[in-house]
């Protein structure tokens, strides 16, 4: 059996639609349409998702690329549980955690050339925003403060922080936040154009 019956949030039946869909404001979703026809995922195993209707789907995007190793992997669950029981979080401001240094060393062994320094973040948006700031800080430290140019791609998505939206090319995001986006960003054409078909 692919999915076992289990309750993991509370004693409520997680296969039903919650009593209220008002409090959770969902990104990139027509909340009105969602309320009329909710699409809920109740469980995941490997590359499969289970809906509240009991249907199984393939998770082709790894939940926005956040679960590339698959869902519900026992060895990952055990390793995470062990770490949470030992130390659940250690902020890296002027204090270190040995595990993060070990992970950085392991990653560095697999990266090309001199790409051997790691800066850990909590999500893709924060990673992009941090990379933008590192690039700006690097050139300022080298005496090139005027060097401030970024290249993005039309229709590109890099996250929802202001820097991410600035280098991204999602039309509605750029229109909505145009007055507060970073200067010095140019966009190259998207590859999905009629002449490329």
What annotation goes with each model-predicted range?
Residues 38-59:
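Active-site and channel-lining beta-strand-loop segments
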Residues 1-8:
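Short, Lys/Arg-enriched N-terminal segments with co-localized hydrophobic residues
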Residues 23-26, 65, 149, 157:
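Tryptophan-centric aromatic hotspots in well-structured domains and transmembrane helices
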Residues 28, 56-144:
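Glycine-rich loop-to-alpha-helix module at the N-terminal edge of alpha/beta enzyme cores
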Residues 105-197:
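PLP-dependent aspartate aminotransferase-fold enzymes
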Residues 14, 39-43, 70, 74, ...:
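Electropositive phosphate-/nucleotide-binding environments in soluble metabolic enzymes
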Residues 8-45, 95:
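Active-site-adjacent loop/helix segments that line or gate small-molecule/cofactor pockets in enzymes
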Residues 1, 54, 150:
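Conserved S/T- and glycine-rich ATP-binding loop of Class I adenylate-forming
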């Amino acid at each position: 059996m692919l999915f076992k019956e289990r309750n993991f949030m509370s004693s409520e039946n997680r296969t039903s639609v919650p009593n209220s869909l008002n409090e959770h404001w969902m990104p990139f979703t027509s909340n009105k349409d969602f309320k009329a026809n909710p699409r809920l995922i109740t469980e995941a195993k490997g590359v499969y998702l289970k809906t509240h209707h009991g249907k199984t789907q393939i998770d082709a995007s790894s939940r926005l690329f956040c679960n590339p190793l698959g869902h519900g992997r026992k060895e990952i669950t055990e390793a995470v549980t062990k770490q949470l029981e030992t130390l659940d979080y250690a902020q890296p401001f002027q204090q270190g955690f040995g595990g993060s240094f070990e992970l950085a060393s392991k990653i560095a062994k697999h990266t090309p050339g001199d790409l051997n320094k790691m800066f850990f973040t909590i999500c893709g948006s924060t990673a992009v925003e941090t990379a933008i700031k590192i690039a700006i800080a690097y050139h300022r430290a080298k005496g090139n403060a005027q060097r401030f140019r970024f290249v993005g791609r039309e229709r590109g998505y890099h996250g929802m922080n202001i820097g991410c939206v600035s280098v991204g090319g999602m039309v509605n995001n750029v229109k909505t936040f145009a007055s507060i986006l970073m200067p010095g960003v140019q966009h190259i054409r998207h590859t999905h154009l009629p002449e490329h078909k």
